[in-house]
A protein has these predicted regions:
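Conserved "landmark" site that anchors the functional core of diverse proteins
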Residues: 1-302
């Protein structure tokens, strides 16, 4: 069988508030108006795949706060759950988080509500086989590309099991911070629209994640960032990690499903390496921005 030949199926018993299929996303298509999408917490996504012997870019399930339940239909599966810490059970029996878990044929894997963080990643050995769109199986909520968000009763094909499982370092995995995160920020392409006082406010004040946040962006509440230029600008390309400031002066941090263009000035950019922290920040989480320099510690690239 080829890598894309279905080996088994799993059934979604409980989809939770929002469960989507995600992988590395669709980088490189911004010039066509297509955003990157992909798993918001890429390190957790990669670790979940590693634990079950998958390539790091294999598709996983990304849950949001409420978890998910799935049944192994026509053969056993090996799964792992990483990212947001959540209770894991197989047919009601406790199972491990951030470790390989065997799910027999007909059994139900239950990932409960997150107790630390927001998004859990469920990898299944072999990888999920949702349709490829522009080289990715990811759901993009803004554009509608990729598979629709999962519903109860949906079935997903799983590729055949890998021939061997790798040895994995059993070092404990840290739980996501659930009360305060600190994000590095670089000056943005429209920083000149803001005075020095606005930059000081951004990098010294504390913000809180608002309820309206989603895979498109983190909306932040806190001190207003006063600008010296116009409230809006002609639409221009937007990137992952951009801190856009609309007319109300409250920053919005673009995440994986962000729009390809934006019409408000971007005061700063959070580098890719820090965005997994933002992926696990739920409503009420405190956020601090730390001024950074391109090429400085922890800043590999944008």
């Amino acid at each position: 069988m080829t890598p894309d030949t279905p080996g088994r199926e799993v059934e979604i018993v409980r989809a939770g508030p929002l469960t989507t299929v995600q992988d590395r996303g669709r980088p490189g298509y911004a010039h066509l108006g297509v955003g990157r999408s992909g798993a918001l917490d890429q390190p957790a996504h990669r670790l979940a795949n590693l634990l079950v012997g998958n390539p790091p870019g294999a598709a996983t399930l990304e849950t949001t706060i409420g978890g998910v339940a799935l049944r192994a239909l026509d053969g056993p599966v090996v799964v792992s759950v990483c990212g947001a810490v959540a209770p894991v059970h197989v047919d009601g029996r406790p199972a491990a988080w951030a470790a390989p878990v065997y799910v027999p044929t007909g059994a139900v894997l239950e990932v409960g509500p997150a107790v630390s963080g927001v998004r859990s990643y469920v990898a299944i050995a072999g990888g999920l086989l949702a349709e490829l769109v522009l080289g990715s199986r990811s759901t993009d909520l803004l554009s509608g590309l990729g598979p629709a968000p999962l519903r109860d009763g949906d079935r997903l094909a799983v590729a055949p099991l890998p021939s061997a499982f790798p040895a994995v370092d059993p070092t404990p995995v840290s739980a996501p911070a659930d009360s305060l995160i600190e994000l590095a920020v670089l000056p943005g392409p429209r920083a000149e629209h803001f005075g020095a006082e606005a930059w000081r406010t951004l990098t010294r004040a504390e913000y809180r994640v608002q309820d309206q946040s989603n895979r498109i962006a983190l909306r932040l509440g806190g001190p207003v960032l006063a600008r010296q230029g116009p409230d809006s600008i002609p639409s221009e390309g937007a990137i992952l990690g951009a801190l856009q400031v609309p007319a109300d002066g409250l920053p919005i941090l673009f995440l994986a499903d962000h729009p390809p263009t934006g019409g408000y000035p971007v005061i700063g950019v959070v580098p890719d390496e820090a965005l997994h922290h933002a992926a696990q920040a739920g409503p009420g989480t405190r956020v601090r921005f730390r001024a950074a320099n391109l090429g400085g510690p922890g800043i590999a690239h944008l």
